[in-house]
Amino acid sequence: MSRYTGPSWKISRRLGMSLSGTGKELARRPYAPGDHGQGRRGKLSEYGTQLREKQKLRMMYGLTERQFANLFIKAGKIREGKHGVNFMILLERRLDNMVYRLGLATTRRQARQLVNHGHITVDGKRVDIPSYEVSVGQVVSVREKSKKLAVITGAVEAVVARPNFVQFDADKLEGSLTRLPEREELEADIDESLIVEYYNKL
């Protein structure tokens, strides 16, 4: 399955959550496309609820189905901790997500484009693979020639707060993952246990 590249507001309304994190998609019409008000759709089945939760998280991080499933399998091989929580931590450690968390981009989609176009380095070396797994202590930076890009400077200026598990130097436009995040620091609107149940039934 290919990555969705259409308007994020359509998916946000269908899933009932803001993929951009701004809430703008749901401000005017907080119901799915095609519906003309709340309460028109029937109650989801158990499978439907699990599938919906999986789609919410997958769309939030912008992964293809294969990427998402492979990362879930990888999380299952981690011996310590819960499968679902480990999965969410692996999603957080993706380079495109770290660029977003550091405030170098306003959305994960924008962050992925910055990585793809070669604007980002890890420990001084250019990395153009969005799925690159960032380790604690590695330094994620903007390439010197890219530091004046309006999309980056604008994003940094718009940041209100950053997660407690990252640190950022606004002068150098670089930051790092200082520790692995705790579950309560990750997406509160996601029930990862439903995603584990979904894949366990396949």
From Swiss-Prot:
Gene3D superfamilies xref list: Ribosomal Protein S4 Delta 41, Chain A, domain 1, RNA-binding S4 domain
Intrachain disulfide bonds: none
A GO CC annotation given for this chain: small ribosomal subunit
Spans annotated as Disordered: 22-48
PROSITE patterns to which the protein is assigned, alphabetical: RIBOSOMAL_S4, S4
GO terms of molecular function: rRNA binding; structural constituent of ribosome
Record domain S4 RNA-binding: where: 93-154
Record-linked InterPro entries: Ribosomal_uS4, Ribosomal_uS4_bac-type, Ribosomal_uS4_CS, Ribosomal_uS4_N, S4_RNA-bd, S4_RNA-bd_sf
GO term, biological process aspect, one: ribosomal small subunit biogenesis
Tagged with keyword Magnesium: no
Annotated keywords: Ribonucleoprotein, Ribosomal protein, RNA-binding, rRNA-binding
Keyword Endoplasmic reticulum attributed: no
SUPFAM superfamilies reported for this sequence: Alpha-L RNA-binding motif (SSF55174)
Domain of life: Bacteria
Assembly and interaction partners: Part of the 30S ribosomal subunit. Contacts protein S5. The interaction surface between S4 and S5 is involved in control of translational fidelity.
Primary role: One of the primary rRNA binding proteins, it binds directly to 16S rRNA where it nucleates assembly of the body of the 30S subunit. With S5 and S12 plays an important role in translational accuracy.
Annotated family: Belongs to the universal ribosomal protein uS4 family.
Name of the protein in question: Small ribosomal subunit protein uS4
Species this protein is from: Lactiplantibacillus plantarum (strain ATCC BAA-793 / NCIMB 8826 / WCFS1)
Lineage: Bacteria, Bacillati, Bacillota, Bacilli, Lactobacillales
